[in-house]
Amino acid sequence: MKHRTRTPSETHGAFPRVPSPQSPVPDVESRVPAVPVVLTIAGSDSGGGAGIQADLKTFMARGVHGTSAITAVTAQNTRGVSSVHVLPAREVRAQIEAVFADFPVAAVKTGMLASAPVIRAVARALRRHPALPVVVDPVLIATSGARLLAADALRVLIDELLPLATVLTPNLPEAAALTGTDARDPRNLQRVIEKLMALGPRAVLLKGGHARGRAVRDRFDDADGSLEFVHARRAGEAHGTGCTLAAALAAELAKGRSPRRAATLAVAYVQRALARGHALRRGGLLLLRH
């Protein structure tokens, strides 16, 4: 009987085909669409509604990859902030350096920076990347009223970080603290905007939620002029709207949008998240649904 040698396909299946030197090797990475990377530098929120947690949810919803550097660990929920542990500046710097060493960061968002040494460390790191869009949310006080920035750090924030901002996103109380002018008085609005722009950012998105009236008016200003966003005031207060707005804005800047277009998309995103908001809490603040 004549013996026949069996082929690999008749034994354990065909061997994998090895490309010859002449045949092109498939480039797997070239088939994967690039995802913009955004770095958020902010405090954590144990309740998940604001801070780093809100930023990362927003980044995912906006289709970008989120990285983070935590500046402070807070014990908080929708009722308030019960504890704040500020990380040493060297630990914040180490996180930022680790991200930049490995990821092609396309935009940066800053939130709660907590202390003057942390602000200096962040500003020093950002100066090494002058072309990066930077969204500065000047977090001073939590929605519940807790102070989130040391009293001696405000001047450092103004002098060292605001000149690096592509877009500055203060609410009215924050704008008043930064300019020394009553930002809730509509007669002062133009003067407040001018003072904020003089601090160095390329653009300002002033959040009007703390003003009185049935409508909320947010205003965007840059060298090309002003743009106003008007929406109906919703009942009650929400948690994490400022963080979410700044994070959405940074995500759109990372995609290459202009600051004006990014602001328009970010405001619309927050309004949708508010409309879908839910009450997974015993406290009095609404949580956004991303």
Which residue ranges define each predicted feature?
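Short pre-catalytic strand/loop immediately N-terminal to key active-site residues, enriched for Gly-Thr
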Residues: 41-47, 226-239
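Conserved N-terminal subdomain of the carbohydrate kinase-like
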Residues: 29-40, 52, 56-143
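Intrinsically disordered, low-complexity proline-rich regions
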Residues: 14, 19-21, 28-31
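Phosphate-handling active-site elements
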Residues: 62-67, 227, 252-266
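Nucleotide and nucleotide-moiety/phosphate-recognizing core
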Residues: 106, 116-131, 191, 202, ...
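Conserved phosphate/ATP/ADP-binding segment of small-molecule kinases
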Residues: 151-226
